[in-house]
Swiss-Prot record:
Membrane-protein topology: Multi-pass membrane protein
Family: Belongs to the unc-93 family.
Gene name for this UniProt entry: MFSD11
Name of the protein: UNC93-like protein MFSD11
This protein's record includes keyword Acetylation: no
Superkingdom per UniProt: Eukaryota
Transmembrane segments: 8-28, 53-73, 74-94, 96-116, 138-158, 170-190, 239-259, 277-297, 309-329, 359-379, 385-405, 410-430
């Protein structure tokens, strides 16, 4: 196998492994609050929203140290160990206890930070400037396809269910745990890419030991430098402006990945299909994500108008979705009790409108995330690690805050928070993009400012 073929093989395996893991984890997150509401009728008392708040809070803090962990352990072993913790979190739902549920939430927060840092490292070492776009697209498509399979199973398995029984819960989460473990094991199929600088056969063992020691020192130096650069980048004008946009992506991530599915499952007006509709909602979020990511990935090379039109499309799509959700869903749906809510929405609650909104949420999310990743890669091509660490830090801490307030705020207040952040986040993105375009037009190096 040629070096290029080996790298492409690694990217495909990386994407398939993440597809299996996140088929399990995203399905788990989508149904967690609904399952826990059924559990709260027993001796178990917990909140899926609180669990996700813990996960994203720990995740954001852990981003500060994970580059050092990956540098020492290596990306492959880091991803494998993280996968085990993901599987452990999912397995907790088979027979949950509050202490194990929240403890696992802490561990998976750390594991998530390690996993995504290692994923970025693995993607980078298996790509060059010519293949990074293609490889990112392959990984994105495989990752987002995870939204289909688990949610498709939920749709058919929970058809006609109004309450989730112990047998239903165990069957689903045993299957999801096995799926997650399959993805975890797949990381061992990733091969080490051929090194461009291989040690000569005539080199002595002393020379090799010296290079190993120097390599370890270099890894430590790089980790410290990245840590320092992260703090310096935090206070630059461009990063502060983009942080508002990033904060919005964290809030809407919480909404479409956890809150919206819960709202659908709690709306009794949907009848016997309310629980299975959670799975169908997840499928259409995935369709929106994949369609948007694929479309904007293909258009990126021929886009004469920059990134702003895509972001504008994203915010318009999201505002339409928020307005329809406001009209179609009862206000108390996010915090409804175990039996759901019989409250009326402003219009007669429609399953078709609910699923349309799922698609719009996914499409809008892909607009924002693809363009944020693009502009960060452009502005900070020489400091990509600390730049993306800040991106993940801001996004995850805002997601944690949103999961926390989702326990208490009615639907219309949650939508209002997203509308405010979405509006100002779009304006701030436009400002940075206009400055970047102006520097390109003048032939200046934007990275020098």
């Amino acid at each position: 196998m040629s070096p290029e073929s080996k790298k492409l093989f690694n990217i495909i395996i990386l994407g398939v492994a993440f597809m299996f893991m996140f088929t399990a984890f995203q399905t788990c997150g989508n149904v967690a609050q609904t399952v826990i509401r059924s559990l709260n009728r027993t001796d178990f008392h917990g909140s899926g929203y609180t669990s996700m708040a813990i996960i994203y809070g720990v995740f954001s803090a852990s981003n500060l140290i994970t580059p050092s962990v990956v540098a020492i352990v290596g990306p492959q072993l880091s991803m494998f160990a993280s996968g085990l913790f993901y599987s452990m979190y999912i397995a907790v739902f088979i027979q949950p206890f509050p202490w194990s549920f929240y403890t696992a939430s802490v561990f998976i927060g750390i594991a998530a930070a390690v996993l995504w840092t290692a994923q970025g490292n693995c993607l980078t070492i298996n790509s060059d400037e010519h293949s990074i776009g293609r490889n990112s697209g392959i990984f994105w498509a495989l990752l987002q396809s995870s939204l289909f399979f688990g949610n498709l199973y939920i749709y058919f398995a929970w058809q006609g269910k109004t309450q989730i029984s112990e047998s239903d819960r165990r069957t689903v989460f045993i299957a999801l745990t096995v799926i997650s473990l399959v993805g975890t094991v797949l990381f061992f199929l990733i091969r080490k890419p051929d090194s461009e600088n291989v040690l000569g056969e005539d080199e002595s063992s002393d020379d090799q030991d010296m290079e190993v020691n120097e390599s370890a020192q270099n890894n430590l130096t790089k980790a410290v430098d990245a840590f320092k650069k992260s703090f310096k980048l935090c206070v630059t004008k461009e990063m502060l402006l983009l942080s508002i946009t990033t904060a919005y992506t964290g809030l809407e991530l919480t909404f479409f990945s956890g809150v919206y599915g819960t709202c659908i499952g709690a709306t009794n007006k949907f009848g016997a299909e309310e629980k299975s509709l959670i799975g169908l909602s997840g499928i259409f979020i995935g369709i929106g994500e994949i369609l948007g990511g694929s479309l904007f990935g293909l258009l990126s090379k021929n886009n004469r108008f920059g990134r702003n039109p895509v972001v504008l499309l994203g915010i318009l799509v999201h505002f339409i979705a928020f307005y329809l959700i406001f009209l179609n869903m009862p206000g108390d749906a996010p915090i409804a009790p175990v039996k759901g809510t019989d409250s009326s929405a402003y219009i007669k609650s429609s399953k078709e409108v609910a699923i349309l909104c799922s698609f719009l949420l996914g499409l809008g999310d892909s607009c924002f995330n693809t363009q944020l990743l693009s502009i960060l890669g452009f502005l900070y091509s020489e400091d990509s690690a600390p730049a993306f660490a800040i991106f993940k830090f801001v996004q995850s801490i805002c997601a944690a805050v949103a999961f926390f307030y989702s326990n208490y705020l009615l639907l219309h207040w949650q939508l209002l928070v997203m509308v405010i952040f979405g509006f100002f986040g779009t304006i701030s993105f436009f400002t940075v993009e206009w400055e970047a375009a102006a520097f390109v037009a003048r032939g200046s190096d934007y990275r020098s400012i």
